From Swiss-Prot:
Region (G4 motif): 183-186
Organism ancestry: Eukaryota, Metazoa, Spiralia, Lophotrochozoa, Platyhelminthes
Residue span of region G1 motif: 48-55
SUPFAM superfamilies: P-loop containing nucleoside triphosphate hydrolases
Source organism (scientific name): Schistosoma mansoni (Blood fluke)
Thermoactivity: Temperature-sensitive. Stable at 15 degrees Celsius. Starts to aggregate at 37 degrees Celsius.
Needed co-factor(s): Mg(2+)
Binding, GDP: 51-56, 100, 184-187, 192, 238, 253-255
Name of the protein: Septin-10
CDD domains associated with the record: CDC_Septin
Gene3D superfamilies per UniProt: P-loop containing nucleotide triphosphate hydrolases
GO cellular component, as recorded: septin complex; vesicle
Molecular function via GO: GDP binding; GTP binding; identical protein binding; magnesium ion binding; protein heterodimerization activity; protein homodimerization activity
Length: 412
């Protein structure tokens, strides 16, 4: 099979027709296989009042029972809890991190309710940045906890957005992809819901709040996303209760007057949210988090560290240059430490040699003293042996003289 060559090339690039199969047409398959083997990461932040249905909606979205501990209304300050799960669907692995607010909106003074949320998002950006700045970094092994999407839960009042909602979404707009959802939308009528949606969009636009819009520049999904953008904010219902209707198991919320089917688009926008969030635009959320929100944070932090854009050099070039300087400084420090270590080793060797010489001198002195003492003892021994020999000779002479005297006496 002959590979096709793209024709949209600059004029100075030659177009060649392959005479046979080469094999680089398998590159997309290689990328897909590599991505599947590594798995994917997706992090969701749910911001909303206590008991508004955050946990239930997440469990409905992923058709999975999560171990969420219930929150209470007694917290003095809002807190966040994050739980990570490893999910698998058709050999595709997903490391899902779910972050929920606890005690959000329960305080009398709600002025700083959103601060812990903003701090959490910034902390995840900072963790990723510090990993990037390491001399020996391993981004593939690093667990990326940057928030890819924030589902902002709006209470179904049917009137308008609360001031806390406007302030919160305004502070989050440049840090995370914000998707507003109307929680427990089955508690208001259809006509009220449509008016409520229109009022929410009007207030968001009048306050110039930037919420996430599904991208329409990709021809493959532009039509679908354009239609779905008109349904924002999504009116959702979550439920873990399942019943059989016409022989089919469906998730519902049952009331004395009837039931609401979670996955019925005539009843709520849950299916639309799931389609847009997980099945169509998950990768765009991930890319936008990295390419827009994280880059904004990264640029600001690098400027704080002393990296600045100028006419001659871009921020990225400045960053790379400063990183290269840091690498050289580190190498220089390593060389200085090595030289210092070598010098200390030499000094220690010199001390050991001096001590060895002193020991050798003492050994030679003791050896000489020992030889002299030995010589003296040998001389004393020789002198004593000579005295003993002389004594033996005198003794023999005396004995001979005594024998001679005895012989003469007998003869007389």
């Amino acid at each position: 099979m002959t590979a096709d060559v793209l024709k949209a090339l600059p004029p100075d690039v030659r177009t060649l027709k392959l005479s046979g199969h080469v094999g680089f047409d398998s590159l997309p398959d290689q990328l897909v296989n590599k991505a599947i083997s590594q798995g994917f990461v997706f992090n969701i932040l749910c911001v909303g009042e206590t008991g508004i249905g955050k946990s239930t909606l997440l469990e409905t979205l992923f058709n999975q029972k999560f171990d969420f501990s219930p929150s209470n209304h007694d917290l003095t300050d809002p807190k966040l809890k994050a739980v990570t799960y490893d999910l698998k669907e058709a050999n595709v692995k997903l490391k899902l991190t779910v972050v929920e607010t606890c005690g959000y909106g329960d305080q009398i003074n709600k002025e700083n309710n959103i601060k812990p949320v903003v701090d959490y998002i910034d902390n995840q950006f900072e963790n990723y940045l510090q990993e990037e700045l390491k001399m020996k970094r391993s981004m593939q092994a690093f667990h990326d906890t940057r928030v890819h999407v924030c589902l902002y839960f709006i209470a179904p009042t049917g009137h308008s957005l609360k001031s806390i909602d406007l302030v919160a979404m305004k502070k989050l707009e440049n840090k995370v992809n914000v998707i507003p959802v109307i929680a427990k939308s089955d508690t208001i009528t259809k006509s009220e819901l449509q008016k409520f949606k229109a009022r929410i969009l009007s207030e968001i636009q009048s306050n110039e709040i930037g919420i996430y819009q599904f991208p329409t520049d990709d021809e493959a999904v532009s039509e679908t996303n354009s239609v779905m953008n008109q349904h924002i904010p999504f009116a959702v219902v979550g439920s873990s209760e399942e019943v059989k209707i016409n022989g089919k198991t469906v998730r519902v919320r049952q009331y004395p007057w009837g039931s609401v089917q979670v996955e019925n688009e005539n009843h709520c926008d849950f299916v639309r949210l799931r389609e847009m969030l997980l099945r169509v635009n998950m990768e765009d959320l991930r890319e936008r988090t990295h390419g827009v929100h994280y880059e904004t944070y990264r640029r600001q932090r690098l400027i704080e560290m002393g990296f600045r854009d100028d006419e001659k050099m871009s921020l990225q070039e400045t960053y790379e240059k400063r990183r290269e300087l840091q690498r050289k400084e580190l190498q220089q420090k390593e060389e200085e430490m090595r030289q210092m270590f070598v010098q200390r080793v030499k000094e220690k060797e010199q001390v050991l040699k001096e001590a060895e010489r002193e020991l050798q001198t003492k050994f030679e002195s003791l050896k000489k003293t020992h030889a002299e003492e030995k010589k003296k003892l040998e001389e004393k021994k020789r002198f004593l042996e000579e005295e003993i020999a002389a004594f033996e000779r005198r003794k023999q002479l005396a004995e001979q003289a005594r024998q001679g005297n005895l012989t003469m006496k007998k003869r007389k």
